[in-house]
């Protein structure tokens, strides 16, 4: 009888021991999972930063090789860009922090070639990709480097993130929005001669005073350097919007009175033909 009690006690002790060992193993596994997760996250973050940097540097080197070798230093441009947002709250990156970046990029754009746009990005870039007569912000080195990219950092972080960043309208001073506002301001303020703007005739209101073109670029055209602004209103056969649309009265009220204003309706089909046939003179396209 006594020996049975001893055996039962011994069996219970073994079960307790196995249970404790099992719990200990689970705790160790959980701790290791957290540790490895943190390490993996840090590695992924570092990889993301390096990957983003490589994209920008490669774009820079490609652009300089094809357009203006020797005038700019890609690593210095990256450094000036990175210091603008690294370690900052992604909703506290005002446009002026990109001033050093703007100063680090050296490029002169010929007068009478600058083309602004609003809600016509695909068409305007299809056109300038096949033509040398007009140039948009995204065709300059500064715009080319960051077109289509997303980036941000975090408070006291040394990393660049390309996901979970604020979108354009999430907060006013986010890194991407502030960059494009500053770059657009710079592009407009350096414009000279006669400039053009391709707008979308399929929209109910082709000009918006809250767009980057309306709120930044038009307001920063220098009347001492810019002679005139021509709106190129791209229209399809079914569109009813014309150059007489009321939104253009708003545009003219914003535009400096010393800058001549003109508007021309351009058939969508004409632009398409000019995109597919680079032999057609630019003067016959726009």
Q: What feature does the model see in each segment?
A:
Residues 18-47:
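Alpha-helical transmembrane segments in eukaryotic/viral proteins
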Residues 31-40, 50, 58-68, 189-286:
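Active-site or metal-binding loop neighborhoods of secreted/extracellular toxin and effector enzymes
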Residues 1-15, 202-215:
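Intrinsically disordered cytoplasmic terminal tails of membrane proteins
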């Amino acid at each position: 009888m006594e020996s049975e009690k001893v055996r039962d006690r011994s069996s219970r002790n073994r079960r307790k021991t196995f249970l404790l060992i099992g719990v200990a193993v689970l705790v160790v596994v959980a701790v290791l999972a957290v540790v490895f997760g943190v390490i993996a996250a840090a590695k992924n973050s570092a990889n993301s930063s390096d990957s983003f940097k490589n994209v920008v540097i490669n774009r820079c080197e490609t652009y300089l090789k094809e357009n203006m070798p020797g005038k700019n230093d890609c690593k210095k441009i990256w450094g000036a860009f990175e210091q603008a947002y690294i370690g900052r709250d992604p909703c506290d990156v005002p446009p002026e922090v990109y001033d050093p970046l703007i100063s680090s990029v050296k490029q002169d754009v010929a007068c009478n070639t600058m083309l602004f746009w609003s809600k016509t990005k695909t068409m305007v870039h299809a056109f300038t990709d096949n033509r040398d007569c007009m140039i948009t912000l995204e065709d300059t080195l500064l715009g080319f480097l960051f077109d289509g990219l997303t980036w941000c950092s975090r408070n006291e972080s040394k990393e660049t993130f390309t996901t979970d960043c604020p979108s354009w309208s999430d907060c006013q001073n986010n890194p991407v929005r502030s960059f494009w506002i500053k770059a657009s301001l710079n592009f407009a303020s350096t414009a000279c001669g006669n400039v053009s703007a391709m707008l979308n005739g399929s929209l109910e209101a082709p000009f918006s005073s809250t767009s980057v073109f309306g709120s930044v670029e038009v307001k920063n055209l220098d009347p001492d350097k810019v002679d005139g602004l021509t709106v190129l209103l791209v229209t399809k056969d079914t569109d009813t919007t014309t150059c007489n649309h009321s939104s253009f009265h708003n545009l003219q009220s914003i535009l400096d009175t010393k800058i001549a204003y003109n508007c021309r309706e351009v058939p969508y089909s004409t632009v398409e033909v000019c995109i597919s046939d680079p032999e057609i003179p630019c003067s016959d396209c726009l």
